[in-house]
Each structure stands twice: as C-alpha cells, then as structure tokens.
Amino acid sequence: MRLNDGRSFSCRSDQTVLHAALAAGIDMPYECASGSCGSCRCRLSHGSVSLLWPEAPGLSARDRQKGDRILACQSTPSSDLEINVRAGDALLEPPPRRHAARVTVKETLCASVIRLVLNVGGPIHFLPGQFFILDLPGAGRRAYSVANLENAAGGIELLIKRKIGGAGTAALFDQCAPGMGLVIEGPYGRAYLRADSARGIVAVAGGSGLAPMLSILRGALARGFGGPMDLYFGVNTAEELFCVPELSALQAAGARVHLALRDGGPGPAGLHRQAGLIGDALVAGEPDLKAKDLYVAGPAPMTDDILARTVRQEAIPADRVFFDRFV
C-alpha cells in the first residue's frame, strides 16, 4: 500500500487501511474509527477495496458520486492500493493491535448503563481517554471508551449506555456474559490526556462519556498532577446517575466534581449539583477556560454544543480542546 507522499506499508486483506497505517507508525487522520465521522476519508487513486460498512454515514452522497472516496476505517484491500491522504510524520499514540479478550465482569450501574470488564491475558497499553473497537458477532464493530488505565494484568473497563434500537448495545446488554470471548482492536483516539501540559484540566462528560473522563483524571492523578481538575458530568435525571463512588473518590483525591441534572432532580450527598444543561454548568463554573485544557466526551449534540460555546463563542484555542463525539 502506497501513499501519495511516497511512504508505503503492508496491509492484510482482513485489516482496515486505517489500522494498518497506524500500526505502521503513520499518523493518518481519523476521529471515531467506526465509519460515522468522515475524518479518515481519503481518495483511492489505484486499486480496489472491500467495505465493512457500505452505508457508513462518514461518506456523503457527493463523496459516493465521485466514486473514488473511501473511509480508511471501513476499507480492507482487495489489491495493492495507492491512496491520497494528508498524513502526519509520526504516530504519537500506541499503535493499535487486535486482541483476543474475555469478559470477566458485567455489572448493571443504572437502567441504561452497564460496566463491562474485559481481559486480554497480558499487558495492555493505551493512553488515558482512548477507546477500543469491539467485534460483535451479528452486530458489526462498535467503539467504546476505556475508564481505567493501562495495566500489566490486561484489564479493560468499559461503561456502555444502551442505545435505543442499537444492535451493538443490544448484543452487549442482552447476550454478553462473563466468560464470553470477544475480539477487540485498539487503542484508538486522539482525545487523550496531554501528560506534558501543566495547565489545569476541565473534563466534560455526557452519559457514558464519563468513561474516558474517568481515565483522564485517573491518569493525571497517577502522574502526580497538582493543578486544578474539574469534572462536569451531565445526565437527564438522578436515576441516570452512575459511578457515584468513583466520582466521590475523585473528589476526595482533589478533583472538583460538578453534576448537571437536566430535570433539576436531587443528587447524591457530597457532590455539587445544579439543574439544567451541562453546557450552562460549564460556562458558569469556568470563567477562565482559556488557561486550561478542555476534554469533552459524550453524545454528538452535547459535544457540538460545548465546542460552540468554547471554541467559537469564547475563542478558546482549538489546540487546547480535545473531544470524543459519540455518534
């Protein structure tokens, strides 16, 4: 496989172009790695590919009409390929790998969220805030963020919210059980903890977006970060709150935890709560965001609202905002 800048790398017929490029240390652009965002869109100048998800929304109708646009995360090679893409010089994150994993824990946290713990049987490497892709038989590939830190024991903790009508979450909620084997691929993700930054940390999570924010704050604490850390966690109702013991532990370790309950219901004792949208809570609680690093994860409407309020309206530098839009 050859890029327009002359670099080349190997890609198996069962491997996506994105996975192969990253595994080869090539910094190919991407965001969701699951076909929805379009960030890994590139032009196929020679060769042919097979598509894992032919209807992936990351390609627009105009892209499809052109006939030579592909999503690197959804394309496996059927021949030698030449691809036109603007790739960076060197990959800064751990390269993705495929792992055989086994479910060790499945725990219901609230009516719509489960905790799933997988184990790959050996050391697992990822940066705080990254995610893995799960191959789900009959449901395709789904991306889920990790809540814990890399470790020698091979454990991966996922917080998964049921998506109404979603085949992936249906498989995990209704069919998955301890002892079940799964194939996972990763790590992926660019919204990881910038460990070399001395700026304060503001983490914003909507729903299961709490998983990567837990990982980021745990990672900062593990590195001895002594600056200010604030976590804003938004849900619709008090019944949708989860991981309250983990939130309390973060607060005890020095982070400030802010809960935003859209319906204004009561919150758990010991944690600051306010009614309304998480974006309102963020703007009210952070008058000096320009001096901090902002991490955001959650549903696309929430993420887009936060970006509009911060990058566009408040002119916060884009290179200090790291987001994972769940689509």
Curated annotation (Swiss-Prot):
Alphabetical UniProt keywords: 2Fe-2S, Cytoplasm, FAD, Flavoprotein, Iron, Iron-sulfur, Metal-binding, NAD, Oxidoreductase, Plasmid
Residues the entry annotates as binding [2Fe-2S] cluster: 32, 37, 40, 73
Entry keyword annotation includes Cytoplasm: yes
Cofactor(s) named in the record: FAD; [2Fe-2S] cluster
Annotated catalysed reactions: 2 reduced [2Fe-2S]-[ferredoxin] + NAD(+) + H(+) = 2 oxidized [2Fe-2S]-[ferredoxin] + NADH
Molecular function terms from GO: 2 iron, 2 sulfur cluster binding; ferredoxin-NAD+ reductase activity; metal ion binding
SUPFAM superfamilies according to UniProt: 2Fe-2S ferredoxin-like, Ferredoxin reductase-like, C-terminal NADP-linked domain, Riboflavin synthase domain-like
Cited CDD domains: fer2 (cd00207), T4MO_e_transfer_like (cd06190)
Recorded GO CC terms: cytoplasm
The EC number(s) this enzyme carries: 1.18.1.3
Domain FAD-binding FR-type per the UniProt entry, residue ranges: 96-194
One Pfam short name: NAD_binding_1
Cofactor notes: Binds 1 2Fe-2S cluster.
Localization: Cytoplasm
Taxonomy, superkingdom: Bacteria
Subunit comment: Monomer. The alkene monooxygenase multicomponent enzyme system is composed of an electron transfer component and a monooxygenase component interacting with the effector protein XamoD. The electron transfer component is composed of a ferredoxin reductase (XamoF) and a ferredoxin (XamoC), and the monooxygenase component is formed by a heterohexamer (dimer of heterotrimers) of two alpha subunits (XamoA), two beta subunits (XamoE) and two gamma subunits (XamoB).
Family: Belongs to the bacterial ring-hydroxylating dioxygenase ferredoxin reductase family.
Function statement: Reductase component of the alkene monooxygenase multicomponent enzyme system which catalyzes the O2- and NADH-dependent epoxidation of short chain (C2 to C6) alkenes to their corresponding epoxides. Ferredoxin reductase catalyzes the transfer of electrons from NADH to ferredoxin (XamoC). NADPH is also effective but with a rate approximately 3-fold lower than with NADH.
Protein name (database record): Alkene monooxygenase system, ferredoxin--NAD(+) reductase component
Encoding gene per record: xamoF
